[in-house]
């Protein structure tokens, strides 16, 4: 019997871009656009992970899936990604509410 190493599942976690501390501060419109792009990219990644999990679930239910662990990994990845997205959303709402409570001048 041959023993092989564990194959990667093809997941590459999102890594935030590195900032150069010597760069001047950009205007708020540029920073807002970059933040918006990051949010949209994160939601697109979440949707892709959930779609993969759903596709593998259908294959598992119909008997077309050869390795059930592929579905288990995809379902867990989708669950963790969803939990992370909800946590980020909650923190963003907390920050927004805190800013709204700040007194003006």
Curated annotation (Swiss-Prot):
Organism of derivation? Nocardioides sp. (strain ATCC BAA-499 / JS614)
| InterPro entries, sorted | FliE
Any one Gene Ontology molecular-function term assigned to this protein's record: structural molecule activity
Cellular component terms per the entry's GO annotation: bacterial-type flagellum basal body
Q: Where is this region: Disordered?
A: 10-30
Q: What is this protein called?
A: Flagellar hook-basal body complex protein FliE
Enumerate the NCBIfam families for this protein: fliE
One of this protein's GO BP terms?
bacterial-type flagellum-dependent cell motility
Cell compartments where the protein resides? Bacterial flagellum basal body
Q: Where is this protein primarily located?
A: other
